[in-house]
Amino acid sequence: MIRLRTLIEKNRSESRKKIVSSTLDSLPEGCISNIISFTSPEDACVAAAVSKIFESAVKSDIVWEKFLPTDYESLITPSRVFSSKKELYFSLCNDPLLIEDGKMSLWLEKASGKRCIMLSATAMNLSSMADMSQRFLWIPCPESRFETVAALREAYRFEFNCRMNTRVLSLRTRYSVYIVFKKADNWCGFKGVSIEAVVGIVGEESFRSFICFDTHGKGQARKRKVVAKPELREDGWMETEIGEFYNEGGLMSSDEVEISTVEGKYAQQKRGLVILGIEIRPAKILEEFSVCRL
């Protein structure tokens, strides 16, 4: 009896889908494109699988121009030509652009179109810190999108403080902040060490947490706070989440996000930390989708 009821409900659901699909298919293709443009890139790719007319409508520049940043024309070089706005969109997702004189890189999150940013180690102002000015070696790295990365020679405390204007980010979006790094052959001094990290919009309440760079470190920190442990990325680097913040403003915003670390008084000698930079991306990363084969 239960099985029969389940089959009936399944048939009803499939019938509703066919009715909706049939109704929408009767609309002009341009109208369908306009409707889809108010969704998201992920939803558009799902819609393309509904029917042939939907697949054709999703290819329209009307759809993908809505998903592009409003200032996208200033982000691409005039000499580069794209066959469609969809091709341009996925180029901005897959090929990070260097901005701010090569101190930052920008790309779009594929599923949502939200902006992502990486601050290079240079933009972290490591060399401006009094105790850190001579403690980093700036070296070229073929694996990096930036000209140089920062390799820690020797220091008792790993501390930095940097700021970035939020206008380069997507408005009304919650972001997660990560420090991206590798371990050099002379890596030492980080085992069991937890470092306090602070992230927040200047003038507003900040997000405080504890991080560690050692994958074998303890799971708990002072005051019973959980320590964020590093994870291996697809590009071979490691990352540790520093914190989160909410970006309300957009291109005209004058807000700044401040990111810093503070180590306790019981510091120990450290070396061998290679820093690529600080990555800022939407806090709720949507799952990768692969149906976009248009």
Swiss-Prot record:
GO biological process: protein ubiquitination
Record InterPro entries: F-box-like_dom_sf (IPR036047), F-box_dom (IPR001810), PP2-like (IPR025886)
Residue ranges annotated for the F-box domain, each copy included: 21-67
Pathway it works in: Protein modification; protein ubiquitination
Signal peptide span: none
Keyword Membrane listed: no
Gene3D superfamilies assigned: 1.20.1280.50
Pfam families, per the entry: F-box, PP2
Keywords: Ubl conjugation pathway
Subunit description: Part of a SCF (SKP1-cullin-F-box) protein ligase complex. Interacts with SKP1A/ASK1.
Name under which the protein is recorded: F-box protein SKIP3
Source organism: Arabidopsis thaliana
Gene: SKIP3
